[in-house]
Curated annotation (Swiss-Prot):
It comes from Methylorubrum populi (strain ATCC BAA-705 / NCIMB 13946 / BJ001). One of its GO terms (molecular function) is structural constituent of ribosome. InterPro entries: Ribosomal_bL35 (IPR001706), Ribosomal_bL35-like (IPR021137), Ribosomal_bL35_CS (IPR018265), Ribosomal_bL35_sf (IPR037229). This is Large ribosomal subunit protein bL35. Belongs to the bacterial ribosomal protein bL35 family. The lineage of its organism: Bacteria, Pseudomonadati, Pseudomonadota, Alphaproteobacteria, Hyphomicrobiales.
Length: 67
């Protein structure tokens, strides 16, 4: 049986670290930031780790070759 293909949308959104955690960029910084405070915008910077249950599903179904 051939290897499963990685979902191309998922490989743009998620990254698996060396320790196996899944990180992603937070949503909400594309447009409409005039109504947000500077603190809210600042807190959306950088990447965040997915919760373990969600990370397991992402690795199983969307990133099968990244385990």
């Amino acid at each position: 049986m051939p290897k499963l293909k990685t979902k191309s949308g998922a490989k743009k959104r998620f990254k698996v670290t060396g320790t196996g955690k899944v990180v992603y960029a937070q949503a909400g910084k594309r447009h409409g930031m005039i109504k947000r405070t500077n603190k809210q915008i600042r807190n959306l910077r950088g990447t965040t780790t997915l919760f373990e249950g969600d990370a397991a599903n992402v690795k199983k179904y969307f990133l099968p070759n990244q385990r």
